[in-house]
């Protein structure tokens, strides 16, 4: 009996070790240097080149699983956009702490710049950090919103950006596993679009994007964080198309 238990234990350990090895190898394959942004792929498009874009977000915007490289660097190097990356992993939209989205957007250096577009990540961290969801208000003034709630923070960012930065706003959602909290945020994001005339890039709800990751384990390091390959082939093309659409309207 002891031999049987020992053999089973060895088998289980072997399977686990194999799974971990495959997982690590998939990430390495997805982060090969050949997938990095490369200026040789630059093809000038006047609607994108030299535009000033502010990115506000957390780990997906930062590139937490791809050595700090995300779609931001792809857009900068391969489309010649002037990008300002205000991204910190693990941070939430809501909160009075200095690293929350709602506090970082108020940095003085940002208010001194002229941006053609603000792109804000719909954070996947608010639910994990137990932030209250909140609700959409009737008011429009940014001082009316409760920034300690996620929806209040979203409304504040929209109002502040329109008033202070005078720029159009694009919120983007992120691919991730099923999460009722995040699903409810996406629902309310569309409600805010009706109220505030914002743009949405719904990667979370994009059927094509979600299908790709089912068949290629090297595109993502986990359920949410892309590798370089994932940024190159999933996020960046979606962003380029959406940004072109938005900026074409502004001309």
Language-model features: locations:
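Short, flexible loop segments at the rims of nucleotide/cofactor-binding pockets, characterized by
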Residues: 30-34, 93-98, 147
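N-terminal secretory targeting modules
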Residues: 1-56, 60-67, 77, 111-116, ...
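Conserved SGNH/GDSL esterase-like catalytic core that processes O-acyl groups on lipids
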Residues: 52-54, 60-141
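Alpha-helical cap/lid subdomain in secreted, periplasmic
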Residues: 102-251
């Amino acid at each position: 009996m002891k031999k049987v238990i020992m053999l089973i234990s060895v088998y289980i350990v072997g399977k686990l070790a194999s799974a971990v090895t495959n997982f690590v190898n998939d990430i390495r394959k997805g982060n090969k240097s050949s997938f990095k942004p490369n200026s040789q792929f630059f093809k000038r498009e006047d609607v994108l080149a030299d535009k000033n874009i502010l990115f506000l977000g957390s780990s997906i915007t930062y590139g937490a699983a791809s050595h700090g490289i995300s779609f931001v660097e792809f857009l900068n190097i391969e489309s010649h956009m002037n990008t300002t990356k205000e991204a910190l992993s693990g941070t939430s939209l809501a909160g009075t702490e200095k690293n929350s989205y709602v506090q970082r957007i108020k940095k003085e250096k940002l208010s001194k710049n002229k941006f053609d577009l603000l792109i804000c990540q719909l954070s996947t961290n608010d639910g994990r950090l137990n932030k209250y969801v909140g609700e959409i208000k009737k008011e429009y003034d940014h001082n009316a919103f409760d920034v300690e709630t996620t929806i209040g923070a979203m409304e504040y960012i929209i109002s502040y950006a329109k008033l202070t930065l005078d720029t159009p706003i694009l919120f983007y959602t992120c691919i991730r596993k099923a999460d009722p909290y995040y699903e409810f945020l996406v629902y309310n994001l569309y409600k805010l679009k009706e109220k505030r005339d914002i743009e949405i890039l719904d990667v979370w709800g994009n059927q094509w994007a979600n299908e790709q990751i089912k068949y290629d384990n090297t595109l993502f390091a986990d359920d949410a964080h892309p590798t370089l390959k994932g940024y190159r082939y999933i996020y960046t093309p979606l962003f380029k198309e959406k940004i072109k659409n938005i900026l074409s309207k502004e001309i």
